[in-house]
Amino acid sequence: MKILVAVAVFFLVSTQLFAEEIGANDDLNYWSDWSDSDQIKEAMPEPFEHLLQRIARRPKPQQFFGLMGKRDADSSIEKQVALLKALYGHGQISHKRHKTDSFVGLMGKRALNSVAYERSAMQNYERRRK
């Protein structure tokens, strides 16, 4: 354990000395040179600029994946238009929603009535014990 601490201290001291040697060679005053934007642009390497542009770029709307999954921009607009037409009497919705006694959410399937839910929970518990 003491050897590990000694190696860590040696590493930190050597990096500090190396950083001081590099800092002594630089004659730049970073606080006064912020007005020279041309000098800053020239000093910035190409890959670093590219990385900053990638970070600053915002995703396109069709690249957004929400909780509902991937959405296609064209089909969602068509679905909205069809829904508006159906609501205002210009068309029909062909698919109907069938209500059941269970709800499937993010946490899994849940029963809407508590008696069926308790019964299924007890059956699952007894099935696991066997």
From Swiss-Prot:
Q: Which residues are assigned to the propeptide feature?
A: 20-56
Q: Which residues form the signal peptide?
A: 1-19
Q: What family is this protein classified in?
A: Belongs to the tachykinin family.
What's a Gene Ontology MF term here? substance K receptor binding
Cellular localisation: Secreted
Might you name a Gene Ontology BP term for this protein? Answer: positive regulation of flagellated sperm motility
* Residues with site note (Cleavage): 59-60, 63-67
Q: Which residues carry this modification: Methionine amide?
A: 68, 107
**What is one cellular component GO term in this UniProt entry?**
axon
What is the stated purpose of this protein?
A: Tachykinins are active peptides which excite neurons, evoke behavioral responses, are potent vasodilators and secretagogues, and contract (directly or indirectly) many smooth muscles.
Name of the molecule in the record: Protachykinin-1
Organism source for this protein? Rattus norvegicus
Q: Which UniProt keywords apply?
A: Amidation, Cleavage on pair of basic residues, Neuropeptide, Neurotransmitter, Secreted, Signal
Give the superkingdom in one word: Eukaryota
